[in-house]
């Protein structure tokens, strides 16, 4: 491709709305452009890389035994009502009505559609296992779309669905897809961790997420260096023991604490650590109000709370000031577990029951109570773990110290059991002629997210450093001055030879300054650069690798072979 013909509107300045390096560089490199918030168009260079990610995914899904199909993005409400997800997913679902007032959604995922499709066609255990996948545009009405391709309202996704006759078969399909995902992300040269994840609205069975590690990741990952334990902060089991005081139970005492509404302020007033307090938080869970009491130095894990309450995630919100005042009789900041109004259900993290003579909110503005003890002064429903993991917590597998790092979720896999087959009455006949529900799995890869995650891991101050397998073009041949015959002719000759060998190559024949050409090549991240410049008359070119910034002058007759050596193994 001649760059004089290429549509590549590069930018020198960083767009003000772009926060992450991947978003900045995709815009600056002329690979994407925003239509509206959370909706992007792929330009030629970006689309070439997108198709390469898709092709890697396609090859590995085929290798894992999945078959490609394509389903409708427009889905009827009735299917989602049958599984209970029309209400559960909440405002993130893009909903619409046709001219006959029938309700639809633009699919964020396709469990309902694929189950409805298969149940009408697949009748016997002899047709199992089956795994179908598609690569398709999905929709999610993000409250705050940001970070470019990382959190958008329209995104391209590979979603696969497996059908098996029993749990053993489902687990085998799950394992096969896990291995397929590892091959996908290995070929994309991503540094990633496989972590336990929360299934959320997908179901309550086992799930794992593939996290590309990045300081800009939206997810927090807890992991252990001493064993293979790794989980999202939403899923991580918190091993945290309260040090019990070696003292008797003291008499409670109400203390005047004016304008002392935070744990930090309380620690200063009482001159003690945060673990001497019990923190009580109030939530609105649908139409109910719930209170949660936890150690003062910890945070509530809202995902664990949602799962325990068995409600859609969007229904859990922090209680409003008006609600707090109604159920505690106090302003925000003074809630405690004692004497809450009858309508409030109190849940207590189990660690609280071991804490002695602690300070709690008095449910009275500007007052706290000290020397409070669970069992004597208040009771609630004890819950084993309602805490959010913190750095330094102990690994639930081996007991060593956990570390926290950030990651970008690029893939996920779920064991769905019979959630969707039961909801949609999808059955087959087993060996004994008896009707059974399908055991299912669901498997997603964010295509655009993977592309952005690669940039997060492979870039510098000059631009992108694409791995060879994903680069929009593998080589750029730069003619420094097209007006000089020896440079133009040598560049054209090398370009033609590379094309004849099937190399994906750009020829920078633009009438731009050398600086512009070099900066553009570095910005768009072409892995190999061949420069026909001042020494072209002596049959000498510059050979440069973007990954290492290594440059050297070589004989022009050798450069094609050098390029082919770099491309071996692709």
Curated annotation (Swiss-Prot):
GO terms for biological process: prolyl-tRNA aminoacylation. Its EC number is 6.1.1.15. Keywords: Aminoacyl-tRNA synthetase, ATP-binding, Cytoplasm, Ligase, Nucleotide-binding, Protein biosynthesis. PROSITE patterns: AA_TRNA_LIGASE_II. Homodimer. Consists of three domains: the N-terminal catalytic domain, the editing domain and the C-terminal anticodon-binding domain. This is Proline--tRNA ligase. It comes from Alkaliphilus metalliredigens (strain QYMF).
């Amino acid at each position: 491709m001649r760059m004089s013909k290429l549509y590549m509107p590069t930018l020198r300045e960083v767009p003000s709305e772009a926060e992450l390096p991947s978003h900045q560089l995709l815009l600056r490199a002329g690979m994407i452009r925003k239509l509206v918030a959370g909706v992007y168009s792929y330009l030629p260079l970006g689309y070439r890389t997108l198709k390469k990610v898709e092709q890697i995914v396609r090859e590995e899904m085929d290798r894992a035994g999945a078959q490609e199909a394509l389903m409708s993005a427009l889905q009827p409400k009735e299917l989602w009502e049958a599984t209970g997800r029309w209400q559960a997913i909440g405002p993130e679902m893009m909903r619409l009505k046709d001219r006959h007032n029938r309700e639809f959604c633009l699919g964020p995922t396709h469990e309902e559609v694929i189950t409805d499709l298969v149940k009408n066609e697949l009748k016997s255990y002899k047709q199992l296992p089956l795994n179908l996948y598609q690569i398709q545009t999905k929709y999610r009405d993000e409250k705050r779309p940001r970070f470019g391709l990382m959190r958008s309202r329209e995104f391209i996704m590979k979603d696969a669905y497996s059908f098996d006759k029993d749990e053993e078969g489902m687990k085998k399909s799950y394992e096969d897809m896990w291995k397929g995902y590892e091959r996908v992300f290995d070929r994309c040269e991503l540094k990633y961790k496989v972590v336990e994840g929360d299934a959320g609205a997908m179901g309550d069975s086992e799930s794992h997420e593939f996290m590309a590690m990045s300081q800009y990741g939206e997810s927090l990952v807890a992991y252990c260096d001493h064993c293979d334990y790794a989980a999202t902060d939403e899923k991580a089991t918190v091993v945290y023991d309260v040090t019990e005081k070696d003292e008797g139970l003291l008499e409670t005492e109400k203390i005047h604490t004016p304008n002392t509404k935070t744990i930090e302020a309380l620690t200063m007033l009482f001159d003690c650590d945060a673990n001497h307090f019990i923190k009580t938080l109030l939530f609105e869970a649908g139409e109910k109000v719930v209170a949660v009491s936890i150690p003062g130095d910890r945070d509530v894990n809202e995902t664990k709370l949602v799962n325990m309450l068995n409600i859609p995630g969007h229904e859990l919100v922090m209680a409003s000031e008006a609600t707090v005042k109604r159920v505690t009789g106090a302003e925000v900041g003074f809630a405690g577990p004692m004497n809450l109004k009858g309508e409030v259900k109190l849940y207590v993290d189990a660690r609280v029951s071991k804490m002695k003579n602690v300070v709690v909110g008095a449910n009275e503005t500007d007052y706290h109570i000290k020397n409070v003890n669970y069992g004597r002064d208040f009771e609630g429903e004890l819950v084993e773990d309602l805490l959010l993991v913190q750095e330094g917590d102990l690994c639930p597998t081996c007991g060593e110290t956990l570390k926290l790092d950030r990651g970008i979720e690029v893939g996920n896999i779920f064991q769905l059991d019979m959630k969707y087959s039961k909801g949609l009455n999808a059955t087959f006949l087993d060996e004994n002629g008896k009707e059974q529900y399908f055991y299912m799995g669901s498997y997603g890869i964010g295509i655009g997210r993977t592309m952005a995650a690669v940039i997060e891991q492979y870039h510098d101050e000059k631009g992108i450093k694409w791995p060879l397998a994903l680069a929009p073009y593998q080589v750029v041949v730069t003619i420094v001055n097209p007006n000089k015959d020896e440079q133009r002719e040598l560049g054209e000759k090398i370009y033609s030879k590379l094309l004849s060998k099937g190399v994906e190559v750009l020829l920078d024949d633009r009438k731009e300054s050398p600086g512009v050409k070099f900066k553009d090549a570095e910005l768009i991240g072409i892995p190999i650069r061949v420069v026909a410049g001042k020494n072209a008359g002596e049959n000498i070119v510059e050979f440069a690798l973007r990954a290492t910034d290594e440059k050297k002058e070589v004989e022009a007759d050798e450069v094609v072979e050098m390029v082919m050596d770099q491309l071996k193994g692709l």
